[in-house]
Amino acid sequence: MSHRKFEHPRHGSLGFLPRKRANRHRGKVKAFPKDDQTKPCKFTAFMGYKAGMTHIVREVEKPGSKLHKKETCEAVTIIETPAMVVVGVVAYVKTPRGLRSLNTVWAQHLSEEVRRRFYKNWAKSKKKAFTGYAKQYDSEDGKKGIQAQLEKMKKYATVIRVLAHTQIRKMKGLKQKKAHMMEIQINGGTIAQKVDFAYSFFEKQIPIEAVFQKDEMIDIIGVTKGKGYEGVVTRWGVTRLPRKTHRGLRKVACIGAWHPARVSYTVARAGQNGYHHRTELNKKIYRLGKVGTEAHTAMTEYDRTEKDVTPMGGFPHYGIVKDDYLMIKGCCVGPKKRVVTLRQSLLTQTSRLALEEIKLKFIDTASIFGHGRFQTSLEKMRFYNRVTK
């Protein structure tokens, strides 16, 4: 017990127990921002797919600091965010035991990619999901019934959320055909305004700029990379035993006293590591890339080189970013292609870091696979004198 005469802080946090595999592949939003009925109706969450990481150079805006007006290099993550499609609205009522679902209204036409979500094996199924429900829109009685459900929401509901799904067919780097679906809470306005707002978006697309803005702080919810079965040193960070230890040294030497005659849950043990559900707070949006605009490229006010945000050769294990995207500071949970849930911050941001306006000077687009030194293929061809005249 060398160097432990006075204290020995435990290794590993107990705040994330149990360390087991997540129940679902998609990040679950367990809380939405607080509602303010004085503001206009707005969506509070979105979903995207992690493409990869690169780095940027920007100028620091921090008056009074030695870094003010100096350049800094920071890592950023690119999350591809194609527009989501609204296919339903669900109402909740507050009860003494929490929120209870009141009723749900679905749109008339649901695409194949979202109907796949309701089957385990689409190929062997009869593919009849929602065919009976859609017939309600064909008759006058059915339309009246749907309007009655909406009026019931306006009368009794306290929380309104829309059912929206991703357009996974636009993700050329993914082989999956089954869309991811989630509930997105609507904040702002009265309950009647929220229901009308949700119904007006039926079978329509929600772009990413309708939910988030540049320089906004957001939360990212997702499932981390899976590592499988790991030992105590990797899983909990406990100290390796001395070299001459009998029967292994990457272990916990003593797992407890004789009595109580059981192993405490606080003792580090081997087991599942990774594929855990995690929420990361306060990720700043550095850029909103819209398809067909200069914002989708890697051009900045200082670097006018015509280049796309996708690095040379594409993002490893992902490919090319062809749709809208978010550029956030730092890393985020999960491997490439993992679906991540983006949520508006639950807190009122007042820090200087959160309110700082970001001005990008340079976005790196060199090949990530290997030691990239060229920003564009044209630059590489010129270096090797391969440019045709």
Swiss-Prot record:
Residue spans of biased composition, Basic residues class: 18-31
InterPro entries xrefs: L3_arc_euk, Ribosomal_L3_dom_3_arc_sf, Ribosomal_uL3, Ribosomal_uL3_CS, Transl_B-barrel_sf
Pfam families: Ribosomal_L3 (PF00297)
Domain of life: Eukaryota
Record bears the keyword Ribonucleoprotein: yes
Single GO BP term: translation
Keywords, comma-separated and alphabetical: Cytoplasm, Ribonucleoprotein, Ribosomal protein
GO MF term list: mRNA binding; structural constituent of ribosome
Subcellular location: Cytoplasm
Cystine bridges: none
Region of interest (Disordered), ranges: 1-34
GO cellular component, one term: nucleus
Similarity-based family: Belongs to the universal ribosomal protein uL3 family.
Protein name: Large ribosomal subunit protein uL3z
The species this protein was found in: Arabidopsis thaliana (Mouse-ear cress)
